[in-house]
């Protein structure tokens, strides 16, 4: 098989037509035979342990089990590459083709796709404008639906009929003197398919647009909902009838393997059991139709086929959940795709990548907003190629091997080189689940001791992170373009507003709010060293650092700035030399005879001084 490299911009998931599903699995052999249809529920032969032909593991459909060897053994070795065996019809190829070659099952009766029937909103229900409950009654053979009312006055288009009502109309229809004609009713997925084929999307969309303009309330909302679905069908050029399956795709056998265990027993994927149920019921329905079995038996078999396809696509979505050994529910196609352990989140979005690391986050209150603390050990591993290049460039070593040896020895030179390397090289921090674009942001790394990543507390709301054991991933942008994009677009200070609401997302929370409250709170209990006087704010902080006063001790501090005048005046004292002392509850002002302020003391705590100084320093620094 030729290896092709195909570049693409995006992947679009769309409804598949029956022709496309056949095209996925069908191949034409040199003798003109078309292979691809799985017709037998058998998997492997119990004596030879080789896959059964036309079964779920058929080598003719899916490719050989052994590299460069056909089923019958006539052709072995790579020199026969591409040859199709005349005896068994198997193409000589690598066994890994069994990971992507598909097959298909031709269904004896159409069945509805359970995603489009039972998911909310139900697209089949919306498109036909029939309540979901009624659609289910039709699909599972409990009620008939009128597809052509003919000239019967008691019938209308899309009217539901019970078994007894239809028998009564049928008796009138086939009477010798009956004037009724053109009456058609249906049941099951075939009836839904006929109704969907009758829907003219363009005409329906035009009619709904008029309804949206004229209608009000719930009727208008319903029209908008239908119009949105119809417009999407028109835009994607999908036929609504494709929501009814006539051909069922069979996924490649290596994605649903059967593995032999030590004791000779086999472990198999649940999908094989679900496919086997579909094939058994499909083959039984074909036989019943061939022998012209009674309608009631055929209808029951069609219902069972519908239920088996439902279980294959989404087990448990409707009806009783199909269980295997030990009453364990079988994993359907939907179970493999969806959820945290599903194919998308586990294997595609969550795959391991180079130049990345992961560790627990801890708070880094001393960091700048655009910085993160990166453990030395992790940083050395992530930036190792850059460090090696720098060591060779500076002439400290001659080759890569010597550089790696120096790194392993933990030479002291390494850390200074690492400091140079990370200077101006942003890193990306990501916290799963990345539900919005702020779940991954760029920071400038600072080397820290220990094994935990240090994160600025202000960016926690954007990541929805807290410090109770959360982990974050680190990624290194390698190219200059990636580094420039990280620096210009993804740096934390540039992601100030929430993309959802437009409101600031960088806001103090949790520990920061509690810390600010603790620093500024009134503490009525007796603290040590109350009512000291200090000549400036720095002296008060120095006394606190020397443990002469407590964080919440009330002290008088000389302050030259403006103070809000909300204090209650207690008394005024006249001092010698004509000075006046105005005493307030939290302030003392000394003035001369011209009322000019000579000195002002305020009552405060070291905690409040500390908060005020921190805010003042950060504001003056930013300016």
From Swiss-Prot:
Top-level taxonomy: Eukaryota, Cryptophyceae, Pyrenomonadales, Pyrenomonadaceae, Rhodomonas
Record keywords: Chloroplast, DNA-directed RNA polymerase, Magnesium, Metal-binding, Nucleotidyltransferase, Plastid, Transcription, Transferase, Zinc
SUPFAM superfamilies: beta and beta-prime subunits of DNA dependent RNA-polymerase (SSF64484)
Protein name: DNA-directed RNA polymerase subunit beta'
A single Gene Ontology CC term: mitochondrion
Enzyme Commission number(s) from the entry: 2.7.7.6
Cofactor: Mg(2+); Zn(2+)
Compartments (UniProt record): Plastid, Chloroplast
A Pfam family of this chain: RNA_pol_Rpb1_3
The protein's assembly and partners: In plastids the minimal PEP RNA polymerase catalytic core is composed of four subunits: alpha, beta, beta', and beta''. When a (nuclear-encoded) sigma factor is associated with the core the holoenzyme is formed, which can initiate transcription.
Organism superkingdom: Eukaryota
Binding site for Zn(2+): 70, 72, 85, 88
Residues binding Mg(2+), per UniProt: 466, 468, 470
Cofactor binding, note field: Binds 1 Mg(2+) ion per subunit.
Organism: Rhodomonas salina
Catalytic activity entry: RNA(n) + a ribonucleoside 5'-triphosphate = RNA(n+1) + diphosphate
């Amino acid at each position: 098989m030729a290896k092709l490299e195909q570049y693409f911009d995006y992947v679009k998931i769309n409804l598949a037509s029956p022709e496309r599903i056949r095209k996925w699995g069908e191949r034409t052999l040199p003798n003109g035979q078309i292979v691809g249809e799985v017709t037998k529920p058998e998997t492997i032969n119990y004596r030879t342990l080789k896959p059964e032909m036309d079964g779920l593991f058929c080598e003719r459909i899916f490719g050989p089990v052994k590299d460069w060897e056909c089923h019958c053994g006539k052709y072995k070795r790579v020199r026969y590459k591409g040859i199709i065996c005349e005896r068994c019809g198997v193409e000589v190829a690598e066994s890994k083709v069994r990971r992507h070659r598909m097959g298909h099952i031709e269904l004896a009766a159409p069945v509805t796709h359970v995603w489009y029937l039972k998911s909310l909103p139900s697209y089949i229900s919306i498109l036909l404008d029939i309540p979901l409950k009624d659609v289910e009654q039709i699909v599972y053979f409990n009620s008939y639906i009128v597809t052509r009312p003919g000239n019967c006055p008691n019938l209308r288009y899309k009217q539901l009929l019970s078994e007894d009502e239809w028998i009564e109309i049928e008796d009138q229809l086939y009477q010798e003197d009956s004037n009724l004609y053109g009456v058609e009713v249906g049941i099951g997925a075939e009836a839904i398919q006929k109704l969907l084929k009758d829907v003219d999307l363009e005409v329906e969309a035009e009619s709904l647009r008029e309804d949206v303009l004229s209608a009000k309330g719930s009727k208008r909302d319903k029209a908008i909902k239908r119009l949105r679905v119809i417009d999407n069908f028109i835009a994607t050029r999908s036929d609504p009838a494709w929501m009814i399956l006539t051909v069922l795709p069979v996924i490649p056998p290596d994605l649903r393997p059967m593995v032999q265990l030590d004791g000779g027993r086999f472990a198999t994927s649940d999908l094989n059991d679900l496919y086997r149920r579909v094939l058994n019921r499909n083959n039984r329905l074909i036989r019943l139709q061939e022998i012209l079995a009674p309608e009631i038996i055929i209808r029951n078999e069609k219902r069972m086929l519908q239920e088996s396809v439902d279980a294959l696509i989404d087990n448990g979505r409707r009806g009783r959940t199909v269980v295997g050994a030990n009453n364990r529910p079988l994993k359907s196609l939907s179970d493999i795709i969806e959820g945290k352990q599903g194919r998308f989140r586990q294997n595609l979005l969550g795959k391991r990548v180079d130049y990345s690391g992961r560790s627990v986050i801890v708070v880094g209150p001393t960091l700048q907003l655009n910085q993160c603390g990166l453990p030395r050990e992790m940083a050395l591993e992530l930036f190792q190629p850059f460090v090696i290049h720098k060591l060779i460039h500076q002439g400290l070593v001659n080759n890569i091997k010597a550089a790696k040896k120096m790194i392993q020895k933990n030479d002291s030179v390494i850390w200074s080189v690492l400091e140079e390397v990370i200077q101006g090289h942003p890193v990306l921090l990501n916290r799963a689940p990345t539900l919005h674009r702020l779940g991954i942001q760029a920071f400038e790394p600072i080397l820290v001791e220990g094994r935990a990543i240090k994160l600025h507390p202000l960016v926690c709301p954007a990541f929805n992170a807290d410090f109770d054991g959360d982990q974050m991933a680190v990624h290194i942008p390698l190219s200059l373009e990636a580094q420039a994009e990280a620096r210009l677009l993804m740096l934390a200070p540039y992601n100030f507003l929430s993309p959802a609401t437009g409101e600031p997302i960088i806001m103090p929370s949790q520990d920061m709010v509690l810390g600010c409250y603790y620093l500024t709170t009134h503490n009525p209990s007796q603290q040590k060293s109350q009512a000291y006087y200090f000549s400036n704010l720095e002296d008060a902080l120095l006394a606190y650092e020397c443990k002469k006063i407590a964080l919440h001790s009330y002290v008088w501090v000389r302050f030259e700035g403006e103070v809000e005048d909300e204090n209650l005046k207690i008394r005024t004292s006249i001092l010698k030399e004509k000075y006046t002392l105005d005493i307030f509850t939290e302030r003392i002002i000394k003035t001369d005879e011209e009322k000019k302020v000579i000195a002002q003391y305020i009552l405060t705590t070291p905690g409040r001084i500390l908060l005020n100084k921190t805010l003042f320093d950060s504001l003056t620094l930013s300016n």
